[in-house]
Amino acid sequence: MGKTLVFGHKNPDTDTICSAIAYADLKNKIGVEAEAVRLGEINGETQFALDFFKQEAPRFIETAANETKQVILVDHNEFQQSVSDIDQVQVTEVIDHHRIANFETSEPLYYRAEPVGCTATILNKMYKENQVKIEKEIAGLLLSAIISDSLLFKSPTCTQQDIDAAHELAEIAGVDPEVYGLDMLKAGADLSQKTVQELITIDAKEFALGNSKVEIAQVNTVDIAEVTARQTDIEAKINEVIAAKGLDLFVLVITDILENDSLALALGAEAAKVEKAFHVTLENNTALLKGVVSRKKQVVPALTDALS
């Protein structure tokens, strides 16, 4: 049957990378030849986790069909977020915690999606269901994914299942989740060396919302002003992306991980829909979104309603 490739979405975050590594590990331990790969560059937060638990980053691929017939998707399902030749391979499994959209297969598959804060929380269960011991390093990566997606348990996407799983995994990994978690988040929030291009692509996802083509990028920081100081250059680069991709709306969500608020920078023909979605007024193309930290649970649903 050959090797199955396991990967998450483009512009990978910590859950995408760590869940791919963990699920490939589980598949191999139950007798399925699998390899974790990635569709983009590793961000600073994820690199911190990989270094801390002494794990190698998965290798980068641009296409999958040239080396396998079967793939497993983790942490995503929407085809525009996946590998470019997704239509040329068979998706045999999906393990995810997002909405289902723009997803169709020609053959039956194993599809597992749960309303939890992180794919890693589901994988923690799957190790138990398969009676496979989670090694210390894998536990550390799964913990890192949960901390990342839940913003150290502060995000509205975080469930009790995520918190319980994180504490189980922290015990196996031998770390204090609060201390380790804050160090990891701070590593990801250091934007001082990031180019403008990196700021708007490091965690960007494309969505079809209503009849609109929308891209939502998110960066975490401990100082929003550090990002807005570069607003002119950021807007120029965003406008290039809008033109190149034919986007109706690009929203950069700049999240303060200490205050748990975000600043939205919105550009494009549908930028006014951000005002409708969040009951705010854009000034200089920006608006403060109080208490908004989750793209999945707070930004995408609000924009979906506004654009429908």
Curated annotation (Swiss-Prot):
<dbReference type="InterPro" id="IPR001667">
    <property type="entry name" value="DDH_dom"/>
</dbReference>
<keyword id="KW-0963">Cytoplasm</keyword>
<protein>
    <recommendedName>
        <fullName>Probable manganese-dependent inorganic pyrophosphatase</fullName>
        <ecNumber>3.6.1.1</ecNumber>
    </recommendedName>
</protein>
<feature type="binding site">
    <location>
        <position position="9"/>
    </location>
    <ligand>
        <name>Mn(2+) 1</name>
    </ligand>
</feature>
<keyword id="KW-0378">Hydrolase</keyword>
<comment type="similarity">
    <text>Belongs to the PPase class C family.</text>
</comment>
<dbReference type="Pfam" id="PF01368">
    <property type="entry name" value="DHH"/>
</dbReference>
<dbReference type="InterPro" id="IPR038763">
    <property type="entry name" value="DHH_sf"/>
</dbReference>
<dbReference type="InterPro" id="IPR022934">
    <property type="entry name" value="Mn-dep_inorganic_PyrPase"/>
</dbReference>
<feature type="binding site">
    <location>
        <position position="13"/>
    </location>
    <ligand>
        <name>Mn(2+) 1</name>
    </ligand>
</feature>
<feature type="binding site">
    <location>
        <position position="75"/>
    </location>
    <ligand>
        <name>Mn(2+) 1</name>
    </ligand>
</feature>
<dbReference type="GO" id="GO:0005737">
    <property type="term" value="C:cytoplasm"/>
</dbReference>
<dbReference type="Pfam" id="PF02833">
    <property type="entry name" value="DHHA2"/>
</dbReference>
<keyword id="KW-0479">Metal-binding</keyword>
<dbReference type="GO" id="GO:0030145">
    <property type="term" value="F:manganese ion binding"/>
</dbReference>
<feature type="binding site">
    <location>
        <position position="97"/>
    </location>
    <ligand>
        <name>Mn(2+) 2</name>
    </ligand>
</feature>
<dbReference type="InterPro" id="IPR038222">
    <property type="entry name" value="DHHA2_dom_sf"/>
</dbReference>
<dbReference type="GO" id="GO:0004427">
    <property type="term" value="F:inorganic diphosphate phosphatase activity"/>
</dbReference>
<feature type="binding site">
    <location>
        <position position="149"/>
    </location>
    <ligand>
        <name>Mn(2+) 2</name>
    </ligand>
</feature>
<dbReference type="InterPro" id="IPR004097">
    <property type="entry name" value="DHHA2"/>
</dbReference>
<feature type="binding site">
    <location>
        <position position="15"/>
    </location>
    <ligand>
        <name>Mn(2+) 2</name>
    </ligand>
</feature>
<feature type="binding site">
    <location>
        <position position="75"/>
    </location>
    <ligand>
        <name>Mn(2+) 2</name>
    </ligand>
</feature>
<keyword id="KW-0464">Manganese</keyword>
